[in-house]
């Protein structure tokens, strides 16, 4: 890690913590409880909203990933997706329930597409020798984020905060912990990669990669499982 600034690495790790706070508290627990228990929606309707977001991510994700891999500036794209997630999370419950569900879908899309860009920044905070280790450290920080998110949300609920106030608190936590990434991460330059790729081209690449992956036993099952995870 001698060729990577510690501030750059730590900021990258903090971003994993930040988005896991969101993932654990909002889609993982509190939004579904608020929507079903307090707003009278069914689990099936919530599942449809979540599936809608995931379909959009599945279509646009390869394009975002290809653009981030080939772009010299990944942080602006990460900023846009993160801002979309934070703002829509902060506004959950502010308007009527249908608008809140739409905001929830936007937050899920922003979170998942942001994760694609975030993963592409791994090359900027690691080298070939320690990339696996750094990636594992990111996962560890993610677990810390889940504990922080659960602890803060539970505490706020116990002292009488409403679900809407918890949503806003999570959005603020996401903003605080993600901010260093936009300030301190030093991006490495990428050479000879196309950054102005079209969505149709990215889907073609995915199909070719999928066919190629079938040559490796177990890889297809792993990719399917990772997608649903």
Language-model features: where?
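Juxtamembrane intracellular "pre-TM" segments in multi-pass secondary transporters
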Residues: 1-10, 188-224
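Helix-loop boundary and gating motifs at the non-cytosolic
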Residues: 2-54, 218-229
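A membrane-interface helix-boundary motif in multi-pass transporters
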Residues: 42, 47, 74, 155-172
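Cytoplasmic membrane-interface "Motif A"-like loop-to-helix N-cap segments
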Residues: 68-83
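C-terminal ends and interior cores of transmembrane alpha-helices
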Residues: 79-97
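Intracellular juxtamembrane helix-capping segments at the cytosolic ends
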Residues: 113-127
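Glycine-rich segments within core transmembrane alpha-helices of 12-TM secondary carriers
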Residues: 132-154
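C-terminal membrane-cytosol helix-exit motif in multi-pass small-molecule transporters
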Residues: 149, 153-154, 172-191
């Amino acid at each position: 890690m001698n060729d990577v600034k510690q501030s750059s690495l730590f900021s990258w790790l903090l971003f994993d913590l930040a988005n896991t706070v969101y993932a654990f508290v909002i889609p993982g627990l509190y939004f579904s409880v608020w929507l079903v228990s307090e707003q009278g929606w069914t689990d099936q309707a919530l599942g449809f909203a979540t599936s809608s977001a995931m379909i959009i991510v599945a279509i646009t994700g390869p394009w975002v990933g290809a653009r981030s891999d080939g772009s010299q500036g990944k942080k602006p794209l990460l900023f846009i997706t993160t801002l979309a997630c934070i703002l829509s999370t902060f506004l959950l419950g502010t308007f009527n329930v249908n608008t809140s569900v739409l905001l929830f879908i936007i937050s899920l899309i922003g979170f998942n597409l942001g994760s694609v860009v975030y993963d592409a920044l791994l090359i900027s905070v690691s080298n070939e020798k320690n990339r696996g280790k750094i990636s594992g450290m990111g996962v560890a920080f993610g677990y810390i984020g889940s504990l922080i998110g659960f602890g803060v949300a539970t505490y706020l609920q116990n002292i009488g905060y409403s679900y809407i106030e918890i949503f806003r608190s999570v959005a603020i936590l996401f903003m605080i912990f993600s901010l260093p990434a936009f300030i301190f991460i030093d991006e490495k330059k990428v050479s000879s990669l196309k950054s102005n790729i079209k969505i149709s081209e990215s889907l073609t690449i995915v199909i070719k990669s999928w066919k190629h992956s079938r040559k490796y036993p177990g890889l297809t099952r792993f990719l399917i499982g990772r997608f649903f995870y």
